[in-house]
């Protein structure tokens, strides 16, 4: 019996007769030979139908195929060094499952709005395929890394009674007779998990009502947020560096084909796998920007152009450490050597992609945290449960958050973050 295989496994079946179920992405003919561009969800490659090698019925069936037709093929796998994939199949038999007209995404240039309107179909194309495969590798690498480091996966709620950072960028939801908000971060609940289980990570969707059309912003995105009990900031930075190096290494090892589809130079990513990220003090980053002629002073936060300039000075991610307390959230621990600073850090991705991680040592002292909540103008009652984490067995602890789509955008070298998620939610888009 002929074995049913995926396109991705073609290399294991060279010169063997196999069966596949596929979709058609494109077709061309030179009279007695029909070239079918095929996909099956694991890879793309070419199928060749030669009139002299198949029955008339099979040849006519191949001629009738329309874009995105679905069908079974039987044939023999051969090497094809001219293609990205490296293999093709000489088809001997074909059985059509579905073959309809009118597929809207043709083999021509389409505008972004048209493609986003048809995102449910655009996902089938080569570029989105490559990005989603890399996204999947990064997800698997994340789970593998943190399990090996002794973390457990911990699930934070989506409905929130209050905002974790006192922000106004919240989606309000009517929760029966009460007000609720969609989560902007699982961090505070992650800290509760760390006090129960030592080391945890949350990984899920978050929501921010940012009225921005910028290339780095969406209203719904995924965050990966570890929290670690008994850990100071320097140890947290070590984990962040190892994690990012491991994740990029996994992409380089498992997604060579997808990187080729995207035209992404893997050598630009390789330095990240070596670690050794510079830990640049905020003060020095300000001086660097001032020396470059930028209008910025101590106490200002960095804009995207500032982060882009800093990132271009390094061949791998860089930590910017110890920001002023005036521009970071209330839950961070102040630097004992300089109380105007928090023990915090952002990871800035290379090639102008800006911030992808943000983290800090959390304030572990009950009275100090209570004061910082009051100074931030927040309702103490809303945060009493959070203060309890310090009141009962509080310990030094640290954590960070990674913007998953921002990190994907850098690794894949995307122009806009909307490509990094299957169905982007933007200020002007909620469908499909």
Curated annotation (Swiss-Prot):
GO cellular component terms attached to this protein's record: cytoplasm
Predominant cellular place of this UniProt entry's protein: cytoplasm
Biological classification of the source: Bacteria, Bacillati, Bacillota, Bacilli, Lactobacillales
Ligase among keywords: yes
Descriptive protein name: Asparagine--tRNA ligase
GO terms, biological process: asparaginyl-tRNA aminoacylation
Similarity comment: family membership: Belongs to the class-II aminoacyl-tRNA synthetase family.
Superkingdom of the source species: Bacteria
Subcellular location per the Swiss-Prot or TrEMBL entry: Cytoplasm
GO molecular function: asparagine-tRNA ligase activity; ATP binding; catalytic activity, acting on a protein; nucleic acid binding; transferase activity
Oligomeric form and interacting partners: Homodimer.
A Pfam family recorded for this sequence: tRNA_anti-codon
HAMAP family: Asn_tRNA_synth
InterPro entries, A to Z: Aa-tRNA-synt_II, aa-tRNA-synth_II, aa-tRNA-synth_II/BPL/LPL, Asn-tRNA-ligase, Asp/Asn-tRNA-synth_IIb, NA-bd_OB-fold, NA-bd_OB_tRNA
């Amino acid at each position: 019996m002929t074995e049913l295989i995926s396109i991705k496994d073609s290399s294991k079946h060279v010169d063997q007769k196999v069966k596949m179920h596929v979709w058609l992405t494109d077709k061309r003919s030179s009279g007695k030979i029909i070239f079918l561009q095929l996909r099956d969800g694991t890879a793309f490659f070419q199928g060749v139908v030669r009139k002299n090698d198949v029955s008339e019925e099979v040849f006519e069936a191949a001629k009738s195929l329309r874009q995105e037709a679905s069908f079974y093929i039987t044939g023999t796998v051969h090497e094809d060094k001219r293609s990205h994939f490296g293999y093709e199949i000489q088809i001997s038999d074909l059985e059509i499952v579905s073959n309809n007209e009118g597929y809207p995404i043709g083999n021509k240039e389409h505008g972004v709005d048209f493609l986003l309107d048809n995102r449910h179909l655009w996902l089938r194309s080569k570029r989105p395929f490559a990005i989603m495969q890399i996204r999947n590798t990064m997800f698997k690498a994340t789970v593998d890394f943190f399990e090996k480091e002794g973390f457990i996966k911990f699930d934070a709620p989506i409905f929130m009674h209050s905002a974790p950072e006192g922000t106004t960028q919240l989606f309000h939801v009517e929760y029966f007779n009460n007000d609720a908000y969609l989560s902007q971060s699982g961090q505070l609940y992650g800290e509760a998990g760390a006090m129960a289980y030592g080391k945890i990570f949350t990984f899920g969707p978050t929501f921010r009502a940012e009225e921005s059309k910028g290339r780095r912003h969406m209203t719904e995105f995924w965050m990966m947020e570890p929290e670690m009990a008994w850990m100071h900031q320097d140890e947290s930075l070590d984990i962040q560096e190892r994690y990012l190096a491991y994740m990029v290494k996994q992409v380089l090892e498992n997604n060579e084909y997808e990187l080729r589809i995207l035209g992404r130079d893997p050598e630009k990513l390789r330095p990240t796998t070596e670690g050794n990220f510079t830990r640049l003090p905020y003060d020095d980053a300000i001086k660097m920007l001032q020396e470059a002629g930028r209008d910025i002073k101590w106490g200002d936060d960095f804009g995207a152009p500032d982060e882009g300039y800093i990132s271009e000075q390094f061949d791998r991610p860089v930590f910017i450490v110890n920001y002023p307390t005036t521009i970071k959230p209330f839950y961070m621990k102040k630097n004992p050597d300089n109380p105007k600073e928090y023990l915090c850090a952002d990871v800035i991705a290379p090639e102008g992609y800006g911030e992808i991680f943000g983290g800090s040592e959390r304030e572990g002292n009950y009275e100090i945290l209570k004061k910082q909540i009051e100074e931030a103008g927040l309702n103490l009652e809303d945060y009493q449960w959070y203060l309890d984490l310090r009141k009962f067995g509080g310990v030094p602890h640290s954590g960070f958050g990674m913007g998953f789509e921002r990190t994907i955008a850098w690794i894949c070298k995307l122009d806009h973050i909307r490509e990094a998620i299957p169905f982007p939610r933007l200020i002007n888009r909620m469908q499909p």
